[in-house]
């Protein structure tokens, strides 16, 4: 007797579309936040972080991003363990994803709201703290979300199909994030 799929094609597409949202957010941050805080060239944007270098080639912004990623590398296995061991009535994964939504929205918004509109050491500390909180928040969504994949497909063909849909959604998110440079001028000129 042939085993039926645990998740129909429509459900697979809906699940994979969840990748689109976090792909836009993560790629927007990775691709544009550096330009936002330390614009290059003759752009009309203000430099918001002092161009401090350590050892002559590591700048403050690199240290901010690196520190946030290091903390992310530590917290990801912790979140995975907590999700795996969860006994919540809504399931092992969904409660973590729901919990992550508001912190991701708040910290994602605050990343684009520096303390001052001018170059400031305070902006370095602000960005470091908010980026760490953002990375932890997004991990509370992404780690359990990705852990759902093996639970949806009963065989490698289904898992591969879902993973392919996720890759397509991720790529679309990357394209959307890459096309978002125009938002920078709006943000610095109008919102701050």
What function would you assign to each model-found segment?
Residues 1-192:
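Membrane-embedded alpha-helical bundles of multi-pass transporters/translocases
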């Amino acid at each position: 007797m042939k085993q039926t799929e645990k998740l129909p094609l429509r459900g697979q597409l809906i699940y994979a579309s969840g990748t689109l949202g976090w792909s836009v957010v993560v790629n927007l941050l990775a691709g544009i936040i550096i330009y936002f805080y330390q614009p290059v060239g003759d752009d009309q944007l203000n430099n918001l972080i002092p161009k401090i270098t350590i050892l002559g080639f590591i700048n403050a912004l690199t240290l901010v991003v690196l520190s946030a990623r290091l903390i992310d590398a530590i917290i990801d296995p912790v979140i995975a363990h907590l999700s795996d061991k969860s006994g919540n009535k809504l399931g092992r994964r969904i409660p973590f994803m729901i919990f992550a939504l508001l912190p991701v929205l708040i910290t994602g918004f605050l990343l684009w709201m520096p303390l001052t509109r001018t170059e400031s050491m305070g902006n370095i500390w602000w960005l470091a703290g908010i980026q760490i909180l953002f990375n932890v928040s997004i991990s509370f969504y992404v780690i359990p979300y990705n852990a759902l994949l093996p639970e949806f497909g009963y065989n490698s063909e289904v898992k591969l199909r879902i993973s392919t849909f996720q890759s397509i959604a991720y790529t679309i998110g990357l394209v959307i994030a890459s096309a978002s440079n125009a938002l920078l001028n709006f943000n610095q000129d109008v919102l701050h």
